[in-house]
């Protein structure tokens, strides 16, 4: 009798919702309102994919910006001042960089929060996943496990870097960055950060392409193989570029260690100012520091 009462209650329409028949109620078929509510996990999953893609694109651009030190110290200095608004303001404004970093931090925290939904929430869930992974022995499942741990590491490593850029945006320059990396003993953190971010980003882009069917073609298996090759090439290229760039900053930091704290001054601008000749236009704006 209690079972009959429960079925009747479940089949009763609530707040204008169409009535469920007794057979559906007995089988436990969810109501339409519950089906509508179940769309939220899919929306959050889409938001996680979008935030991850935006962060990956930012990291690609960021790597090319910081690697400009391989071209010359002046090239990196010019790019740093450009992002402080030197090209269109009377003088560079480091707070512009802080604003950009703040947006990146917000996106980073959003992506981390969305990703935490899929982490094992208890030791029991962790054990179940490990058993599942060992039974399947599927490469993509293993990649997700690697991505989970690199993401966990990034939560701490990237936060240190972002906080420094947020609070001290004026200390971005050839000498300043090299001093922070070498004299400030930050190079181990940057080395770990480099491996974590490139491995995590490469796997993330690969899984995004698989999930949304990008670049797979008519043959899914052949498309998956192409994506694996692209993922490997992506990670190797940016790891190589990052290691060479970090080595360049370390070498500059070693050479500049006895003058740590000295700000970089462009040679051309310094010589002209010493000769009481001021460069004009965009060249002068890009060569100035705040307050000069």
Task: Locate the predicted segments by residue.
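Membrane-embedded alpha-helical bundles that constitute the cytochrome b-like, heme-associated redox core
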Residues: 2-292
